């Protein structure tokens, strides 16, 4: 994590995994520091709230075992529900240690800082294809991370596209692939 700290003064590592420092106590610790970074970044415009409803089309390009891959997806808001009482399903058990860490961070920042990775059935790929059509010709925000993964992000604000994608995805189950602890903490924190 030290390399990520050095990479950029606004690296999200300062929020997600702020390091412990000598002399940390109840009033000044990794969670309160993360909250201060978040507050300052919002004030400075490093992080900004999008005022309009949107879907965020997200691509990752990476190599594995000598092959090139493109992972396509999108970010959206979902309704928080208890597992088994709605359409959101876990695939693994969670543990108290990681949940406590995420709870302390969420309480300090009053924000969910990272997305939950979910999968839903769409054998015809209808939702993603609508989004790919919506971003055709857009210049994405692009960044390459410390592992060499290239990230592309495009914002879709077209109400018709958002409505159509929502109609496809809303009735389907969502299986959490990564982020069980974050989901449970977000649900408990609402």
Language-model segments: which ranges?
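A cross-family signal for N-terminal binding/gating loops and helix N-caps
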Residues: 1-187
């Amino acid at each position: 994590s030290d390399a990520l700290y050095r990479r950029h003064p606004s690296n999200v590592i300062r929020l997600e995994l702020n390091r412990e420092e000598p002399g940390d106590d109840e009033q000044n610790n990794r969670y309160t520091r993360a909250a201060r970074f978040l507050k300052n970044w919002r004030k400075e415009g490093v992080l900004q709230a999008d005022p309009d409803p949107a879907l965020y089309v997200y691509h990752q390009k990476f190599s594995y075992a000598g092959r090139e891959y493109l992972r396509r997806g999108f970010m959206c808001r979902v309704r928080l529900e208890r597992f088994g009482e709605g359409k959101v399903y876990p695939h693994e058990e969670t543990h108290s240690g990681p949940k406590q860490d995420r709870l302390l961070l969420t309480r300090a920042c009053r924000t969910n800082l990272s997305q939950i990775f979910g999968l839903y059935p769409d054998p015809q790929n209808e939702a993603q294809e609508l989004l790919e059509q919506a971003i055709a010709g857009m210049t994405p925000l692009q960044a390459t991370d410390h592992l060499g993964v290239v990230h592309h992000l495009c914002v879709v604000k077209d109400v018709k596209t958002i409505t159509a994608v929502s109609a496809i995805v809303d009735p389907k189950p969502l299986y959490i692939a990564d982020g069980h602890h974050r989901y449970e903490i977000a649900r408990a924190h609402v």
